[in-house]
Amino acid sequence: MPMATAPQDEYRALELLSRTPYGRVAVSMRALPFVTVARHIVVDGRVVLRLHGGFGYAQACDGSVVAYGADNLADREEGDESVWTVQFVGMARRYVPGPADLEAFGRAPVAADSTPFVPEYLCIEPQFITMHHLEGVPARRPAHSA
């Protein structure tokens, strides 16, 4: 699998990440893999994640190598037939966001699985970044109309 190792590719991958607010973080927890949704921002070449603390995922990720991925599959505008994906791995560490970070994240969700959303933050320095583009991908249309 080709790795995006050229600095311009890494810059482009982080620029694409900054265009979409959510992705998925994956880590091993009790020897089993899990994946969960996370809100992300890109800050000085690092990716900062906001997760719901009630799930315990930030604690499980802290100090571990995680994989993170995001794409524009759900965020494409009408007529946009370009799909991109960005994935990377890196060490996740708990993070205390500053005022600028909190502003960039915007309002947190109100609830997660019917419980009050309690934000926890992780910071990852991306390594082994991969980026893929697909062209000519038509927008998905519902199979059935309501």
Predicted regions and their residues:
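Charged, gly/pro-rich active-site loop segments
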Residues: P2, A67, N72-A146
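Short, basic/aromatic recognition patches
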Residues: P2-R24
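Short solvent-exposed loop/turn micro-motifs enriched in small/polar/acidic residues
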Residues: S18-T20, L32-P33, T85, T115-F117
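Sequence-level motif detector for i,i+2 pairs with an aromatic at +2
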Residues: T20, D44, G63, V83, ...
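Short beta-strand segments
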Residues: T20-G53, Y68
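Short glycine/serine/proline-enriched coil/turn segments at secondary-structure junctions
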Residues: L32, A58-Q59, E78
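Short, surface-exposed beta-strand-loop junctions and turns on beta-sheet-rich folds
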Residues: F55-Y57, P138
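Short coil-to-beta transition motif at edge beta-strands of beta-rich domains
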Residues: A60-A67
